[in-house]
Amino acid sequence: MAYPTPESLDRVAVIGTGTIGASWAALFLARGMAVNAYDPEPGASKALQAYVDRAWPVLNELGVIVAGADQTAIDFYDDPADAVRDIAFIQESVPERLDVKHTLFQAMEPGMAAHAILATSSSGLLQKGLRHPERLVLAHPFNPPHLIPLVELLGNELTDPAAVDWCQNFFEDRCGKKTIRVLKEVPAHVANRLQAALWREAIHLVLEGVASVEDIDKAVVHGPGLRWSVMGPHMLFNLASGGKGMDVFIERFGPSFAVWWDSLGQPDLTPQTAAILAEGCRAEENGR
């Protein structure tokens, strides 16, 4: 399949304009593209424009907005097939319910151009029922997409590899994003799994009385969080080897990590746990 170049796109479609879809729309508008939009919720058109208007000053301050970008270049449609007609790139962000998504995809597909790519913000690929499953690509953002650079890209055995390549070029070169390739389907993909692993241990430390909610948050913000904003855990530990490489780091420090891993907790999110964390968060809020 020959797809148009990302640079040639002057209009895209956003299907589902809740928080995630509206954020995508704000980004696409800022990068000089017009947006066809669809959402069946009453008042969705006004809500979308209001979201974009709130986001625009921040995008301008961050230098995201390109010359000629128009924050009002939104056409709202009542029919998803009309919204995607003659559009080369479609970003779908409707609620994560299989029945809703499958019904929507079936309604959209008659209007989709032969070369159109359908990117979904969903947590899994949903190709069942599509006449052209090869053009569905998972493009999972870290919220909100108009501010956080990360997009996780995933295709499976039904996906055209060229469609995934195209999405990488589109998000990076046209939208200024940072993409990673997820090589196999796992629950929550990559970034959310890393986030979940850290939060699990943070909860465990609270429940064990090791530190307060506020101090655990401080430990992340003023410690490893500063490092992680620059580079990831593998490269940090690789550099900690003194230039000798990751294998030397593991040989030297691996036994210590193994002991720490054995002591990591697996807390349950019970009502009691929720109450303890909520109380800790209220205390942290009051201290700010």
Q: What label would you give each PLM region?
A:
Residues 40-43, 47, 58-117:
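Rossmann-like NAD(P)-binding element
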Residues 1-62, 111:
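NAD(P)+-binding Rossmann beta1-loop-alpha1 motif at the extreme N-terminus of oxidoreductases
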Residues 117-183, 188-193:
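Rossmann-fold dinucleotide-binding core
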Residues 15, 38, 77, 93, ...:
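Structural motif
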Residues 41, 160, 211-215:
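Helix N-cap / loop-to-helix initiation motif
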Residues 172, 199, 203-212:
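C-terminal regulatory/interaction module of P-loop NTP-utilizing enzymes
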